[in-house]
Amino acid sequence: FREKYPDIEFHYREYPDLPVEQLFAGNEGNVAFSIGEFDEHLYQVVPLETFPIGLLVNEKHPLAQKESVTIEDLQGEPMFIESSQFHIYHLITERCEEAGFEPDIIFQTSGFSLCHKMVKANKGISVAVDFVFDDMREDGLKLIPFSDGNYEWKACMLTRRDEEENEGVQCFRKHVQEWLQKIRSGEIIR
């Protein structure tokens, strides 16, 4: 983006999902990226892509024999998961509560890499987004789809409805959408 639009001032900061939303609601920044559903009365929401979430297990774990899993399969299993600052944590814990149990979360982290390491060591299970699993793929790990509902990571770009988009924001939106189209067409790899 900076190469294509050198005259547009661009600053980028990365935070977990919930702090991004809190900062953006407090008028920090012009554009935000986050995961989940958003109030479309407050924000112009551009859905970017939706990714399936699966259960991450060591291939030696008994659940690795399954072709698909349900949320009930997590009951009693030690789990490593991204912290409560991320939507994936709330999706999984809410589904567990709806199924009538509390997940056995033994560690909350700020990233998927520790979850993958602990599952590789067969210390427990985790959940992961398909593209993260593909990026971090290692022998001995298996990502199993959920069969009891929609488990998705919906990435969105947000701007505020009550603000007129300046030229920089418009150019950035176009750049992001063109970049995603190139990924979808196979022209570039994520």
Tell where the protein language model's regions lie, with residue ranges.
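Central regulatory/effector-binding core of bacterial HTH transcription factors
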Residues: 1-40, 109
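A local structural motif
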Residues: 4-12, 97-106, 141
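Beta->alpha turn/N-cap motifs
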Residues: 16-17, 33-38, 58-59, 111, ...
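Alpha-to-beta junction loops
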Residues: 24-33, 53, 101, 119-126
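Beta-alpha-beta core module
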Residues: 41-52, 113-162
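Flexible hinge/capping segments at coil-to-helix
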Residues: 43-53, 57-79
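Secondary-structure junction motif
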Residues: 78-99, 165-173, 180-189
